[in-house]
Amino acid sequence: MATIRIHDEQNTSIENQEEVEQFLKRQEVIYEKWDITKLPAGLKEKYDLTDEEKQEILDVFAAEIKDISERRGYKASDVISLSDQNPKLDELLKNFKQEHHHTDDEVRFIVSGHGIFAIEGKDGTFFDVLLNPGDLISVPENTRHYFTLQEDRKVVAVRIFVTTEGWVPIYEKENVNQS
């Protein structure tokens, strides 16, 4: 279940599932909970994935991917795995933590591990969405955001795209978020 942490003076947290869903809906962020128990035991918490294992993950969630793709016009998907096993993890995270936006939605379904999307809210205040296995999020097009990992520094996620080329980040600021 996802939780919210608002970057306000009170550092407000939202943990109740219904309140999380309502908050994200007001921000026009799509949030869904997919059945993670469908994932075969051999793929749970596995971060060094072969191409065949990545395809198996896509196959397991093919119906869900097809459903959201038909509703939203998405055309492609893949699986990304980030962990300390990747020697370039710190470099990747530095790039991910730069505020950016896209001209299409950024969609992630968390298969294993954890991730955080920091998203600029409608009022200009950023909020974090702390994601866990089974959580799907779609950050709307032209919404400033960045992604990072939680303390465990590992995630496997299905990425879903509007085009077969994937997405291209548009950076407007030079700074890199370090918080």
UniProtKB/Swiss-Prot annotation:
Binds 1 Fe(2+) cation per monomer. InterPro entries: ARD, ARD_bac, RmlC-like_jellyroll, RmlC_Cupin_sf. It is an enzyme of class 1 (oxidoreductase). It catalyses: 1,2-dihydroxy-5-(methylsulfanyl)pent-1-en-3-one + O2 = 3-(methylsulfanyl)propanoate + CO + formate + 2 H(+); 1,2-dihydroxy-5-(methylsulfanyl)pent-1-en-3-one + O2 = 4-methylsulfanyl-2-oxobutanoate + formate + 2 H(+). One of its GO terms (molecular function) is acireductone dioxygenase (Ni2+-requiring) activity. Pfam families: ARD. Ni(2+) binds at residues 100, 102, 106, 145. It comes from the Bacteria. The record marks 108 as: Important to generate the dianion. The record marks 105 as: May play a role in transmitting local conformational changes. One of its GO terms (biological process) is L-methionine salvage from S-adenosylmethionine. Its EC number is 1.13.11.54, 1.13.11.53. Keywords: Amino-acid biosynthesis, Dioxygenase, Iron, Metal-binding, Methionine biosynthesis, Nickel, Oxidoreductase. Its cofactor is Fe(2+); Ni(2+). Pathway: Amino-acid biosynthesis; L-methionine biosynthesis via salvage pathway; L-methionine from S-methyl-5-thio-alpha-D-ribose 1-phosphate: step 5/6. Belongs to the acireductone dioxygenase (ARD) family. Monomer. Catalyzes 2 different reactions between oxygen and the acireductone 1,2-dihydroxy-3-keto-5-methylthiopentene (DHK-MTPene) depending upon the metal bound in the active site. Fe-containing acireductone dioxygenase (Fe-ARD) produces formate and 2-keto-4-methylthiobutyrate (KMTB), the alpha-ketoacid precursor of methionine in the methionine recycle pathway. Ni-containing acireductone dioxygenase (Ni-ARD) produces methylthiopropionate, carbon monoxide and formate, and does not lie on the methionine recycle pathway. This is Acireductone dioxygenase. It comes from Bacillus licheniformis (strain ATCC 14580 / DSM 13 / JCM 2505 / CCUG 7422 / NBRC 12200 / NCIMB 9375 / NCTC 10341 / NRRL NRS-1264 / Gibson 46). The gene is mtnD.
